[in-house]
Each structure stands twice: as structure tokens, then as C-alpha cells.
């Protein structure tokens, strides 16, 4: 028990609370709101903080609060919508920070600790085990080849710190899921490690091909994928997709699942045409959508 307490107390100083304001007219405000709260992990003594993208996208102002109550104005230093991670920068030096665990060091059954903000200088802690490491696909045109699912439920705001029992950062807590019982889904810290220098230098990942963005919410349905909703003014809506459309094929490939849909879409680039075979009200037809650039649309 004393060892666990020492571990928690060693991690706490490197955890932060985030308060973010977003303009009413930013495209993300409709779904994510204009006043957001989050958690973050200090990953650099010079003030870089790792968190989740959905907390910071569109930020007009960011306030960072350390566990002892000291506050700093923050700036969004980098966004990576494909991984779902973001970096905040504060003007401070000599900060306590978390080291990244070795690459591919996380294993199923491994004990872990989550620390998340529940208030400006308040933190909550939960413990559990890694239950699985598998892909995840979300309805907002998002997919990761590997995630960390844990039996530890996120006790606070999104962006919480996931560490091993050596106090090393292994992930950033993104979602609480209720599919079977309660568990949390974290983005592996390896996604940050792979592009750390690019994110710090450019504020984005430039070495990876950009994915086209369509602005729709595909949902699995009876062995097919159906359009569950549309982003107003997005490419899918502008080129004629409608809510309720069943996607039969993309680029001549039959689509049976959301991962298959994303894999086919993402073979293209922003500005290129993507061909769909659609079933709508018992009529099937072909339709083309020119993919947009999500990073441009949601730029702060």
C-alpha cells in the first residue's frame, strides 16, 4: 500500500487541469461546446502537456492549473486529429514531468493507474488492469489500429494520465466505454512518441499522408454501414449523401463494416474524388464525394 501511495504522489505533480474556451462560431462548438474541461500530463520539463484533441480543438484560450493551484495561460502547440492527441504549451521551466514507457511495453493483464483532474487543483485516482489492446473505430471518421482498454474507469475529465507501476506514461485516457461493464479507452503514448518532434516543430504531423474528411457519421447496421448523420456544410452533405443512406461499395469494394469503409476512404487524399455505391429507399446508385481537409475546417 505504501508503495502505491508513493507511486501516486510521484505522478500527481505532473498532472494538470485544463479549462478551454472556444468561440461560438467554431465548427466544433456545435458538438463539443464552448466551455470545456480536461486533464493533461506534463511530458517535458519546459512545459509541454499531452492531452486529447477534443478538449482543445478550436481553443481561443487555455488555462492550465497545476496540482498545487498555480495557474498558467496555455497555447495549443499541436493537434493530431488522426491519433486524437494534442499538445499544450505553457511558459514554465523545470516542471516535474512523466517519462514515456518503452515502446510496445504494455501487456494485457498489466496493472495500471489513472489520474485525472476533477477540478482545478483536484485529482482523482483509479486503479485496474489492461484488459485488451485492440483496434477502435468511432463514428466521427476516427480509427486507431491499437488502443489500451483498462478495467480502471476514468475518474475525472478526458485526457487523464495512464501510467504503469513504474510511473511511466503509457497512454492518454480518451473515453469511458460501457459496452461490456465499465472500462476506459486510452490512446497509447507510442502515437505521441512516433511524431513528437514533428508535433513540437510544426504543430502537426507532416510526414504522414493526409486523410480525406467527408463530414458524416457512419454507423454499422445489419452487416452494412449506414449514414447516421451529416456535418452541416460538410463534403458528404454538399455532394448529396443523406442520412439513412446505406453504403454498399466504396471505390468498387463491398463495404461490410466501418473499418472497411475507413480503409477504403483513406486510400484517397483531400481534394480527390471518392466513389460510392449507395442504397436509398430501395434504389441503388453511384455518387462521388470530393474529400475535404478536416484540419483546415477545424483550425483554431
Model segments located where?
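PDZ/PDZ-like groove recognition
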Residues: 24, 153, 200-264, 279, ...
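Active-site region of chymotrypsin-like
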Residues: 14, 23-26, 33, 91-97, ...
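Conserved active-site neighborhood of the chymotrypsin/trypsin-like protease fold
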Residues: 23-25, 31, 37, 42-124, ...
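C-terminal cap/linker of serine protease catalytic domains
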Residues: 1-8, 114, 165, 169-222, ...
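Terminal peptide-recognition signature
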Residues: 16-18, 40, 47, 51, ...
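Flexible, gly/ser-rich surface segments that form the specificity/activation loops bordering the active-site cleft
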Residues: 3, 33, 55, 98-104, ...
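Protease-domain processing segments flanking chymotrypsin-fold serine proteases, especially trypsin-like
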Residues: 1-32
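Short, compositionally biased
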Residues: 125-137, 261-270, 294
